[in-house]
Amino acid sequence: MIELSSKIFPRVSTRGFYDLQNGKTLTNTYYEIYPPQKIETIINKSEFVIMIHGLRNNKSGALAKYIIAEKRLKRLHYKHSVIGYSYDSNIVGVQYKSTAISALKTGLIIAKKNGRNLARFILDAKKKNPLAKIRLMGHSLGAQVILSTIEILAKNSKNRNIIESIHLFGGSIPSNSFHPKKFGRSFQMIVNKKIINFYSPYDEVLKAATEEQWVDTPIGYKGSVGLNISKYTQRRVTPRNHRFASYAATLNSFP
């Protein structure tokens, strides 16, 4: 287990659920929680945040992102708990041009499949505590996990407003994702209050990914394109680099 100064960071995990080579599903299990009693305690409180990391994060790398999120939110006087969402994102070959495209495709497959897992955790949490406010925070590829989660939740009208808010940082999803004819209606239905997209034209990773055509123009690079839903807003920021720590430093208020 991953430990931090004698305490185990609360997290939902799907590590080992998907093949890192091709994205194939290896188990029908929805998720695992650590430590169970702490997760149960958090779920039964008035609200909590789920932080979803990006690509190329092993267990320890993911943990670092949760700690960054928790520290930043505490500094902004947010008093509620953060739960980490840990998934198979440590894809081999992303850092090499010769294998980057195939590796990114695998990462995208796994991120999309994790929507099913995260959606189930959210539904289970709301079943135990219907009044809990659940906020999502996603960095880079974590935005895709969130998008896929919203798509699944939107299939049932009973899930209306089940998510309180969403914060995206350097998101890798397409720039037209919040158009009403794309995924906008699903977000408008599922999110109760707001979706905030933190984007940066200076993000070197998203710039390279766009120029190399590894991904469609990401919403975290130059913001949203075209018509957007009313619950969506965006903020242009100047992080030092693509890392979550740099984006988190641009967050001046929460929620």
Describe the role of every protein-language-model region:
Residues 50-54, 139:
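The conserved beta1-alpha1 loop
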Residues 135, 139-140, 165-167:
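Residue in the alpha/beta-hydrolase core beta-strand immediately N-terminal to the catalytic nucleophile
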